[in-house]
């Protein structure tokens, strides 16, 4: 078993190891999205996983749906996004471990989204409320 396989087995309890490894290899940043809603079953699976990460990581990660304003303009350092109406906000109380927890659980969610057939793109920073 490779180091990556060992890490995957530990980090993603219950996930099919090969699905996770495939998701890691396939995952890439996407800035242009299809103009269609997230499939209900995919949405439910993603929300369930987000809830698990929130419980485990003491966070308040949220799936924001049907909200096109946040990415309507060009974002400095990231370029132009197209058809972004759904996104995940990584939210938690400010403390010494918040950035680490958001990065760890955010990446777990990004990989779960990839396994569910959703493309993603990390965007960092602090933004005003919409």
Name each model feature, range by range:
Residues 6-130:
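Acidic, surface-exposed loops and disordered segments
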């Amino acid at each position: 078993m490779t180091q990556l396989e060992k890490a995957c087995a530990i980090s993603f309890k219950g996930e099919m190891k090969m699905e996770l490894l495939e998701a890691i290899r396939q995952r890439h940043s996407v800035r242009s999205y299809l103009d269609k809603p997230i499939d209900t079953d995919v949405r439910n699976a993603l929300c369930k996983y987000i809830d698990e990460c929130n419980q485990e990581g003491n966070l308040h990660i949220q799936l924001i749906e049907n909200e096109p304003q946040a990415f309507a303009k060009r974002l400095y350092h990231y370029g132009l996004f197209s058809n972004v109406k759904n996104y995940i906000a990584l939210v938690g109380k400010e403390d010494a471990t918040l950035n680490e927890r958001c990065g760890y659980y955010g990446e777990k969610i990004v990989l779960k989204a990839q396994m569910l057939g959703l493309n993603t793109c990390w965007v960092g920073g602090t933004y005003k409320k919409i």
